[in-house]
Amino acid sequence: KSTSLAAMVDHRNQNSYGHIITIEDPVEFVHPHKNCIVTQREVGLDTEDWEAALKNTLRQAPDVILMGEIRDRETMDYAIAFAETGHLCLATLHANSANQAIDRIINFFPEDRRQQLLMDLSLNLRAMVSQRLLPMKDRKGRVPAVEVMLNSPLIADLVFKGNVPEIKD
């Protein structure tokens, strides 16, 4: 996951202009400035905690925000808010498939917030990438199995209606 996120940040850094902010615990890859200004914040070193880092992120006028791992509802709230304000938000979440990732996101929130959440996801989600390392036939290594789900009118409609299991079909 970390290597894939680092590759996405590096691609953006090489092929676009702007400001990339990473919030990590710990910083795993150092990104030098290329076409973008890259500000890397390590929780506990550069910022007191996740909450403080996330709260101060928009003050730095980023174009891209890498949030590391989403572990709780508060962090997910920030990710959605960043996406709603037009920022590209990259993060990881433990899940075995795109469907499971969407279910995990939904389950962070209480029932009374679900309809708004589904609408927000349907409008702001751009892609989900699910990765698993599987053993090779010879058992002498592992090979990645990658699922990429891009948002489309059909996916957005299924998410909006809460028909997440149908996405697999």
Where are these regions (language model features)?
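Short, flexible helix-loop junctions that flank or precede catalytic/ligand sites
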Residues: 1-169
